[in-house]
């Protein structure tokens, strides 16, 4: 009971900081249960983990607001935003040294993500957050913690997690928007589309460091030839530009909106909040933004559809390197994304390896085919669509070669799209491509077997399938992770560079990838399982049990967000320790 908590606080006041450890446990606060899950070691350490549980009966939310994963995730996102707004007003109002008085929850961006900050269970809602337990030096200041737990938090919780305290109409619109967005995404295949951009969308962002919509920007207007209408379950009829499956080229002068459109499409794999401007920019959920990554690690990837007959006789059907070139990195990225189940590739000429994308006629005359190991993307894009079902949306500004293979050509003119397919196709006959001989298209084969690196120990690790991955009886040394925002993280002594995994949008997703990779290395990498087998195991249990499945004690804190399966593949493929 909360009375006992108050008594405990008063009994440990002015004692040394470790006495806070005795507060771990559950406390009933009437209409919610407070759980102190982890107590920080000292006031300068990472803050303590605290959570609350509220029954569905007490929260009062309509059942249809959490009837499935989509609505449940959306409701949790809304509640997390409300709670974060409330607790930010009280952070550091309790005084002390170090992180004393810190009160913080997950800070959400423009996209809706599934976060451990708020989860819906059969019994109710669980919210997780961080609290800096106050101290003067390293002496407990329980009076200040009492303010947080008994004065500040109850107000924040009441205003954030109870239906009667919230704007019911705003929440309804929030849920209905998410359902409409998902309806469009599910409708795309039936309409033979890979993406949709609604009329009136605001695509430009406020600045390079802000993802909020730019004020006074030009609303998106679809060309008539590509305009379609969709009847949504809640909003009703909307119109916009449907991008057909196949090969789509986005062209135009500099600063006319080509990359802005592509950036909106790459984030269209996520649902967006009301007022974002891109609420109805919807992309195939499996879409992957690809680029060259000089220096990246590649292990056992079949890039032979793009690169063959290397001078060093390296086998490109099972290619490995510690320091990839632009072309080999982009080839590997495409093959890895195919393995990850992508049906749509998004590319920008500006961030691609030029020699990987195209070879002009003059270069083909100078460098004979048998002397060039690279089969450019230009010569594989049609096969990728016709034989593998993978569409491409490409931003191009310098080479006209792609006009010949494009099914749809969109010109961005001062942020206004124009369908110029017919007029460009007439011009193609005046600028024919030279005849080329391309080897037959074959789907790549996965070769990568994941083995545990030496630093994670060769001793016995019990995995969740109930078998053993090695011999021995001692407990293995656990690897530590350090997160660096969306740029990547370290696991043990290995750095995982995710700077160019552009659809990784939140540091909490990076933290989740660190958790998943750590689990894979410690429990699954045994020298027998392939990378796809391991990713599918991770994804299955993530979907069924959530991220807590991958922690040592099956408990999770605030600070994690679920990544897509495509980013899980990208993370494991970039881990040099395997």
Language model segments and positions:
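N-terminal pre-Walker A segment at the start of P-loop NTPase domains
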Residues: 204-239, 274, 282-287, 291-298, ...
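Carboxylate/His-rich catalytic cores and anion/metal-binding grooves
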Residues: 189-195, 199, 255, 262-293, ...
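Conserved alpha-helical scaffold flanking the Walker A/P-loop in AAA+ ATPase domains
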Residues: 325-337
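N-terminal accessory targeting/assembly segments
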Residues: 1-192, 203
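Conserved NTP phosphate-binding and transfer environment spanning the P-loop NTPase/kinase superfamily
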Residues: 386-389, 395-578
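Glycine-rich phosphate-binding P-loop
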Residues: 238-270
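Flexible beta-alpha connector loops of hexameric P-loop NTPases
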Residues: 141, 296, 306-327, 359-374
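Conserved P-loop NTPase nucleotide-binding/switch module
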Residues: 337-381, 385, 398-404, 408-425
